[in-house]
Amino acid sequence: MSTILLNLDFGEPSKKAFGGNAKHQRFVKKRRFLEQKGFLSKKNQPPSKVSKLNSEPPKKGETSRVDSISKILSCLKKKKEAAASKRDSEQSKDKKASLSWLTPAPSKKTDSVVAKIDLLGEFQSALPKPKRRTQKKGSKKPLKKKIATENSTQTQSKDKGSNKKPLKKNAVQNSTQAQPEDKCPKVPQSLPRKMVAIDCEMVGTGPKGRVSSLARCSIVNYNGDVLYDEYIRPPCYIVDYRTRWSGIRKCHMVNATPFKTARSQILKILSGKVVVGHAIHNDYKALQYFHPKSLTRDTSQIPLLNRKADCPENVTLSLKHLTKKLLSRDIQTGLSGHSSVEDAQATLELYKLVEVEWEQHLAQNPPEN
């Protein structure tokens, strides 16, 4: 077994003098010097030293410095006061000079009163005169005076035979002036309404292609000019293009307009207009839209056209047959299919044949929407 030896010293340790930092000692000396000179504030000084400094009388050099500083401050205050007084005096002089032309220097009592009155008169004459109120145009009294003066001057200058013309002029003036100026001329209630003709071509969708979907729409104005003619891609898959009748082929659907956008464009054109069509209910069904009956003209339901074509009124004639009979024109010919633009133009020309008579009939028997 190894033994452990411990050397313990129970005596008091030797006290070493704490020298401190030389830089700190220099700072303390400078601080004491500044405190003695009075450059440090009372907050930075301990209370014991502050009381000593206050109790000690100032030295000769310090008193001279304080006196010089106080003299400089007093001089600066005096200069500021003098400058302020000069400014006030200059402003008062300017005010007096600006108002001197209103108050003349009186030599005697009578002269001063007369001068004041003259100046007041000049001042009032220089002021702008108030404008007189003019009477309203619709008032009756000034009109009578003007008419009387005009008649008197005209009678003096002209003979008796020439007095009739100014009387007529005055009558016209009275009639025009009696009418209120704010009212505009009345607009006729029955304005000519805009009219368009429409024709649509369909393709077969749904089971076995039995559902008719819109594939082309053409709209022409009253003069036959084309307003709208677009191929339209239906939302459903096309089973039968019906090219023999519609003229629609697969290539026409490549860049065709979608149904929703085409429908919104078409309805904007039709809104508020008289729409002419042949068997137009089929076109409205393909558009998923129904126009007001009062603004719809269906040439397949007008008996006047059947009468002109020497056909029974109760029979629904095709557009091709009516065009051949009444317009002496052949449409829908060839194997390329129908043209919706051609059909719309033919429909409009057929309606123009009976437009006046049919519109009178509708005015007497308006259709119920």
Swiss-Prot record:
Per the record, GO CC terms?
nucleolus; nucleus
Check the record and name the Gene3D superfamilies matching this protein: Ribonuclease H-like superfamily/Ribonuclease H
Q: Where is the composition biased (Polar residues)?
A: 42-54
Which segments show compositional bias classed as Basic and acidic residues?
Answer: 81-97
Q: Where is the composition biased (Basic residues)?
A: 129-146
The subcellular location is: Nucleus, Nucleolus
Keyword Nuclease attributed: yes
Quick one: where is this thing mainly located?
nucleus
Q: Which InterPro entries match?
A: Exonuclease_RNaseT/DNA_pol3, ISG20_DEDDh, REXO1/3/4-like, RNaseH-like_sf, RNaseH_sf
- Keywords assigned: Exonuclease, Hydrolase, Nuclease, Nucleus, Ribosome biogenesis
Top EC group: hydrolase
Record region (Disordered)? 36-68, 80-107, 125-188
Q: What EC designation does it have?
A: 3.1.-.-
UniProt KW Nucleus keyword: yes
Q: Which CDD domains match?
A: ISG20
Q: Could you tell me one molecular function GO term of this UniProt entry? A: 3'-5'-RNA exonuclease activity
Question: What are the Exonuclease domain coordinates in residue numbering?
Answer: 194-369
Which one GO biological process term can you cite for this protein?
ribosome biogenesis
Q: What does this protein do?
A: 3'-> 5'-exoribonuclease involved in ribosome biogenesis in the processing of the 12S pre-rRNA. Displays a strong specificity for a 3'-end containing a free hydroxyl group.
Q: What is this protein called?
A: Interferon-stimulated 20 kDa exonuclease-like 2
Question: What is the originating organism of this protein?
Answer: Rattus norvegicus (Rat)
